Amino acid sequence: MTTKYQAPLAAGWLIRAPSLLSPTQRHWLFRPGALTAGLRQLGKVQLRVVSEHAEGASLDEARAMLIAPGSPVWVREVLMSVDGIDSVPARSLTPLAASHGSWQGMRRLLTRPLADMLYHDRGVTRSPFVCRRLSSPLPFYRMALPPNHDGSAIWARRSVFWRHGQPLLVAECFLPDFWRKVTLGRAIPPLKAHDRRA
């Protein structure tokens, strides 16, 4: 997989992790390759589909995908747990027409991760990662905020995959319980060969 030029940044997104974050946080926010592969090095990963639906693209997400705000998009929201601990909510979206075309596989994943269709296709390119602290009114914030949130910062990353000129925006955030888990274990697992792809 090759890396594509990043679209103009939407407000709040950063091309580098701020210095206030720990090395472990910076590692996970900009870790290359499939995130699920990294999570599996920490424990048993389970994926639950929270929602699949059509909506209008927000200004923030539309800018990342180079489409007009309000354009119809297909959204898939999931929650990944590690050893039973809710760890990583993820939100993926693509133009509605692309969900029946270039990215139609997104509709057939069920409980399989997006990596199953992204990292085996040489025709797919990906933008560099950007990160930010989640806040309202971002759509991802409403989905990702855990019921027992203690007020601590929730950091997210996102990138855009491109196939046949069609974007697929993938955002992932790391919940406070995830950081507690990696702090207790090996905070920065070594990358395996198949994880080193950009």
From Swiss-Prot:
Location (main, coarse): cytoplasm
Domain of life: Bacteria
Catalytic activity entry: chorismate = 4-hydroxybenzoate + pyruvate
Keyword Protein transport among UniProt keywords: no
Pathway(s) served: Cofactor biosynthesis; ubiquinone biosynthesis
HAMAP family on file: UbiC (MF_01632)
Its job: Removes the pyruvyl group from chorismate, with concomitant aromatization of the ring, to provide 4-hydroxybenzoate (4HB) for the ubiquinone pathway.
PANTHER family named among the record's database cross-references: CHORISMATE PYRUVATE-LYASE
Protein name from the UniProt record: Probable chorismate pyruvate-lyase
